[in-house]
């Protein structure tokens, strides 16, 4: 089942998406937005966790408050994109070049902490 917000973007009804999403957080978690032109979409606060954005056109999009953990931006056009501050450039580059899932600094720290706890408890 396709989510309503996702369906609007896949059908290139960006103006309608922006009207609907203006009063709520757009739910695009785990959405397949491969190849979509999202340049005019208001995604500033969107939930894009786990979204598949391969080859999507994100040029100039403000994602500064978007939830991006687990999203993939492989081969996406990202010139001028404002990414959240908790994603470093290396993480973004790896996702663009190799399709790795994005991890924020916070989620990486939690993963490292969990690994460290396991290692420490095994000693």
Where are these regions (language model features)?
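Tandem repeat scaffolds
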Residues: 3-8, 12-123
């Amino acid at each position: 089942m396709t989510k309503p917000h996702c369906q609007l973007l896949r059908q290139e009804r960006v103006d309608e998406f922006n009207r609907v999403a203006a009063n709520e957080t757009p739910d695009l978690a785990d959405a397949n937005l491969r190849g979509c032109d999202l340049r005019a979409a208001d995604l500033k606060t969107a939930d894009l966790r786990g979204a598949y954005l391969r080859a999507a056109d994100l040029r100039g999009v403000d994602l500064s408050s978007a939830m991006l953990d687990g999203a993939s931006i492989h081969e996406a056009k990202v010139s001028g994109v404002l990414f959240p501050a908790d994603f470093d450039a290396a993480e973004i580059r790896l996702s663009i070049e190799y399709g790795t899932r994005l991890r924020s600094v916070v989620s990486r720290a939690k993963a490292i902490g969990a690994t460290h706890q396991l290692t420490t408890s095994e000693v």
